């Protein structure tokens, strides 16, 4: 399957002309052979000093299929044990990469891609995406989720110039990784609702065509969950296609708004380990658990609006003590304050918010019920409860605050 990126780079009904940086997207068996051909005699032959970034698990799984590519590149294999997209991993790459690198190949899943795109951005070199699992939607985005000085941030980075997703590789990834990809997509229900509410309340820029793209990704996966979980190659390709569509939606907007909202903020809090210890869970697993928690809270708010129990009041920074208690003990308080400036809530009057309540209720009512979402995730083998990711029940309330 070849995805024509030009289909997404055109004048849009939202009034903007979306920019797409990726030149080629290939999702099929033998895609890495096409990559090797392009590096040898095609559009990538101009790059003469390429760096592959992968981890120990990925190297072992791809060594045979990608032997010719590895032979022509500097290959940097990071220890998969405890690997995070953080300053430590970035320093390892920077300290070991050759000075004349002119192309980076990210061979792996989400963590490897975040590290690679961040390095590519900082060193102003292009990168190629070689996804090895359909585990998330970050392969073609222009942002990276990086932990810097203890704070999980979404930082500007670069999109790949090409994607070579080889079905012979990613369809054979552990089912847990595939389930994590389904989890990441199912959370888009929350993301799109958040974006619609922000547009309603603050007038934030909103693109209906991008929303349709995310909805197409959701529909693609929902209709094929059973076959995807059974490892059917054609359906795994559809999952990868849906994840790349979601990433293209972010690339079109220029940030993560269409695909990362309240549920991702909750997971970033967990990643910072200020209200919990280390979690042995994949990003997608944390996202599906957070999405269910947020969905339950949203449905509770919608019910309160319906019953006339929800009213707007002037914004007051009532959580200062909670912030101090949560982030102060790790010396992160000032950095967190900077991340959240300016405080948007200060600009929203209670009168305006009160007028928006019915619209907010309507948007939330469009979301699937908690039971429907739970069953979808259960069918796909996704994480659903805090216990599934090793989180204590006591962390739920501060996570939502």
Positions of PLM-derived features:
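A glycine/threonine-rich phosphate-anchoring loop and its flanking beta-alpha core
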Residues: 23, 122-220
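A conserved active-site cap/scaffold subdomain adjacent to cofactor or substrate pockets
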Residues: 215-303
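ATP/NTP phosphate-donor binding region
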Residues: 1-103
